Amino acid sequence: LVERNKKMHIKKYPELKSEIDKAYKMVLDKKVLPSMRSMQFGGKPIEISPNRIYNCAYVPVDHIDSFSETMFLLLGGTGVGYSVQKHHVSKLPVIQKPYPKRKRRFLIGDSIEGWADSVKVLMKSYMNGGGSRIEFDYSDVRPKGARLVTSGGKAPGPQPLKECIVKITGILSEKEDGEQLTTLEVHDIVCHIADAVLAGGIRRAALISLFSADDQEMIGCKSGNWWETNPQRGRSNNSACLMRHKITKDFFLDLWKRVELSGSGEPGIYLNNDKDWGTNPCCEIALRPYQFCNLCEVNVSNIESQEDLNERVKAAAFIGTLQAGYTHFHYLRDIWQETTEKEALIGVSMTGIGSGRVLGYDMEEA
């Protein structure tokens, strides 16, 4: 895995071969770690879809393409933070149902792009107006258990996608022409999308949903017996987005009481300075809309000197810089590449802090 990962970077940055070799000697010595997505999908999968090198991303659901992009990212192994805040969802087109007597067949491609396109086609059929009712053809989707050649593993078969399409259609068909999707409906659609993402028969999608602090439907999203009536909501952590400069003590305590009464420990509380910024599912970092996080890690459990620490951090930052250059996203809107290049994040974390070995060293120097 390490050699495959290294060769991928050398192929992209041949002029940096000696520096890459040096940095990856530290990877082999277990002193630093690249992004786990880059280890998992190093080589052809990332060369085909560079988004797969990134652990997580953030997208506001303010555009019809946000739904298909979420499917695309989740299927590629990237966790997704998304916003259903009122000012984002209000930008979505209103519902304009397809003509029931006019039908159009859509053959779903046997690929990540094909699955994402099925969501895109479905959403457009209910939001672009005057279109045909889509009849999805799953015949090209490989059967359950078939080998996935590029990324490895086994195919889930068409059933998870069928269920996803049926459930999303159920939400859309209940609306009247001219109505807008509610924040909770948008949230549920994204959760149904996540339900379709499986690997080896196990759910493999990470989500966090940020919503407006006064959104009562979203606050109660996981109240009552939601796991029976709306089990898809278990795919996402749900967090109220509170503006630090606006929040009052009384409002916070009222919301905290709702958390206690929910019995689920949710909603979470996400403190923010800008309502348009979001985060990744683990809340490790603030992200602009349409931005990816980029992580490397330093093993500090066996640091031997300040110089050793400095060299490890330097190597991790270098690998992170290499990873940040994978931005030619072929399926996503152009704004993803623009944002990720403009705000090229280089995250370097530490593991092994509990050993205490690193506590005596100068972090600022490192």
Can you describe what each PLM-predicted range is?
Residues 1-366:
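Extended catalytic cores of very large enzyme megasubunits
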